[in-house]
A protein has these predicted regions:
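Active-site cores that bind ATP or allylic diphosphates and position pyrophosphate for catalysis
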Residues: 18, 31-170, 175-182, 190, ...
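Hydrophobic alpha-helical segments in the ANL/AMP-binding
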Residues: 8, 126-128, 373
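Single conserved hydrophobic/aromatic residue that forms the stacking wall/gate
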Residues: 1-11
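Catalytic adenosine-cofactor/nucleotide-binding cores of aminoacyl-tRNA synthetases and other
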Residues: 149, 161-316, 378-406
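Basic, alpha-helical terminal appendages of large translation-related enzymes
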Residues: 5, 14-16, 20-23, 27-49, ...
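Short, charged/polar micro-motifs that form catalytic or ligand-binding hotspots
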Residues: 144, 194, 359, 363
Length: 406
């Protein structure tokens, strides 16, 4: 579900759980046994390990020696539970008419008689995937090009059962900028990783679609445009490199161009899932302040961090920032508080003259007044514009925070 949410949750069919369809898988195994397209293998684990060791010593790929392929059940050892192996073709070749890679062919004698049912009675991936795809009337099987050997095996299963084969497309794997395959050890290798830092579904979908595929000079695609223009034939054969800086740029575009109402809804969900539950009063302030909070934000996490001065009741000022609060700066703050107390209307039009007068009276510049205010109100000398900060917090909270710095 998180993967679906992370890409926008546009999939409308019910989730399919392979393990719940084991009975159908086993029926197909029995059918393959009945038609002579599968057989029981009684080789022990030690025998298989010995075969693998010999192959390793000869420096050749391991292929099961098909010992039980043509043996009679009469020869079967007592009290040994067999595995079921698919009887792969030995003569000729198997071809994939791949929508991305073109025609790919392999000699059948290089495909082993692979296991389709384990000793414990559970079916293996290639059997289960073939059965499920057939039951669900899959027209296209799209997966990474590291699965080509599985496709050759599955094609033989389809042919043995006289099922109509789906179309296959093997897309290149995504690599790191260094040219290595993405792995779980990489910081951002799953959709969950991107969700946690606040990459928006539309941005991630748009970026992934453009990896190794293009349509004219167009960079930004809505969901509707993605469906309209995307085609498998346009995917390149070479691996694409995942560039986090481009993902962030794409996400920044979507943040800037999303309506504040839609963005706020996404932000609220992000906080609930990955940060904290924020009370309604503070959420309302954030919603009204989104126009400046999203400025320069590249992720939802950036917006969250920009909003911390609203979310946090206690502002922690680090030693480096505290050193900037000189006696002169504190006197400016006291004067600011006194003048703010005197105004009825609290907006930029009434605040601007106060700050301008303080600049003039103290023979300083805007930074000389704005920086100490920002530090006390947010805990940082960086952040949104000072008027945005002051107005979003409101008169009471501003005065409360300023009064805590002596």
């Amino acid at each position: 579900k998180s993967r679906s949410r992370g890409l926008g949750d546009v999939y409308k069919r019910q989730e399919y759980i392979q393990s719940k369809n084991i009975e159908s898988h086993i029926k197909v195994v029995n059918k393959l046994l009945e038609t002579g397209n599968a057989y029981k293998c009684y080789c022990s684990s030690d025998e298989i390990e010995e075969q693998k060791l010999r192959a390793k010593q000869k420096k050749i790929p391991y292929i099961y020696n098909r010992k039980w392929r043509d043996k009679s059940e009469i020869e079967a050892p007592q009290d040994v539970k067999p595995v079921i192996r698919f009887k792969s073709k030995i003569e000729g070749s198997t071809k994939i008419n791949d929508l991305v890679q073109g025609d790919i062919e392999i000699e059948n004698n290089t495909i082993e008689d692979f296991i389709i049912l384990r000793r414990d009675g559970t079916p293996t991936y290639n059997l289960s995937a073939s059965v499920d795809d057939h039951i669900m009337d899959m027209t296209h099987i799209i997966r990474g090009d590291d699965h080509k050997i599985n496709t050759f095996k599955q094609i033989q299963i389809y042919e043995a059962l006289q099922w109509e084969k789906p179309l296959f497309a093997h897309i290149p794997l995504i690599h790191t900028l260094e040219g290595k395959k993405l792995s779980k050890r990489d910081n951002a290798s799953t959709i969950d990783d991107y969700e946690k830092i606040g990459i928006m579904p539309d941005a991630l979908r748009n970026y992934l679609m453009r990896l190794g595929w293009s349509y004219k000079d167009k960079e930004i695609f809505s969901l509707e445009e993605s469906i309209k223009y995307f085609n498998l034939e346009g995917i390149g054969k070479s691996p694409s490199k995942l560039d986090m800086s481009r993902i962030l740029s794409m996400n920044e575009y979507y943040i800037k161009n999303k309506s504040n109402d839609d963005l706020f809804q996404s932000f609220e969900e992000y906080c609930k899932n990955f940060k904290e539950n924020i009370n309604n009063e503070k959420l309302n302030i954030i919603k009204k302040s989104l126009t400046f909070l999203k400025n320069k934000a590249k992720t939802m996490e950036d917006i969250y961090n920009n909003s911390k001065f609203i979310i946090n009741d206690e502002i922690i000022i680090e030693k480096a920032e505290m050193s900037l609060l000189t006696e002169n700066a504190k006197n400016i703050i006291k004067s600011f508080m006194k003048k703010v107390n005197e105004i009825e209307v609290f907006n930029k039009e009434t605040l601007e003259p106060i700050i301008n007068n303080l600049i003039s009276e103290n023979q300083t510049n805007f930074k000389g007044v704005g920086q100490p205010l920002r530090i006390i109100l947010t805990g940082s000398k960086f952040g949104p514009g000072i008027y945005d900060i002051i107005i979003s917090l409101g008169k009471k909270r501003v005065l409360d925070r300023l009064s805590k710095v002596g």
